[in-house]
Amino acid sequence: MVSTWSGMMTEVPARIVAIGRTASDRALLRRALGELDARHRLSSKIAAEPNLASIMTEFVTRLTDAFGSLSAIRGQAVLDIACGSSSSRSPVTGRQTSEFESWMCRLLVELGAHPVGIDIGDLAGEAFEHHRVDLGVPGALDFLASGSFDAIHESRLFGSPEFRAAHGSATERIRREIRRQERRLLRPGGVLIHSDGQPHG
């Protein structure tokens, strides 16, 4: 059952839905956001943490820019590196926060894609393929088959205070390893979507 957004939140989904470039994309977004609300209480989490609306808007914009239309995402295999988890905590307050949940993978599921989430946090119970992985371990992504993804998304991993605190001087080595793995894992003609929000073919 698709939920409806509470009255005070109607401007939030409307702003996100408006990103869709076609009527078809806007209808697809409306359904996807409704499902995210029903399954993951998106509207109440946005009410508690307003920055989540900006994060969702950014994700929708990235996907639209990368694929040209949201309907083109259906059936695509997408790897989300450091996808976030329900166990994530704010690096500032130390409290659990909805902002770092696996929203991109959840959105991709609702748009008909086949996401694979990679994170060090707990992803148990999520409706997409996921793997708990420490990206600081050399060869951490070797288990994934070469050329198996149409797109790879990585958002804010290397700017994360948590990541820098955990890996310190190894951060640049890890960045080089992840970039090498991205080239190996991406299918010819696939797209990389990095934290600057721009697709890189």
Predicted regions and their residues:
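Short "lid" loop at the C-terminus of a central beta-strand within the Rossmann-like core
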Residues: 84, 159, 197-201
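A short helix->loop->beta-strand "cap" motif at the edges of active sites that frequently abuts
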Residues: 111-113, 187-190
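Class I SAM-dependent methyltransferase Rossmann-like catalytic core
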Residues: 13-72
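A short acidic, Gly/Pro-enriched loop at the edge of an enzyme's catalytic core
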Residues: 139-152
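A short SAM/SAH-binding and catalytic strip from SAM-dependent methyltransferases
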Residues: 150-172
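Class I SAM-dependent methyltransferase SAM/SAH-binding core
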Residues: 79, 84-139
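Conserved beta-strand signature within the Rossmann-like core of class I S-adenosyl-L-methionine
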Residues: 189-197
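A short glycine-rich, Lys/Arg-flanked "PGG" loop and its adjoining helix->strand segment in the class I
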Residues: 168-188
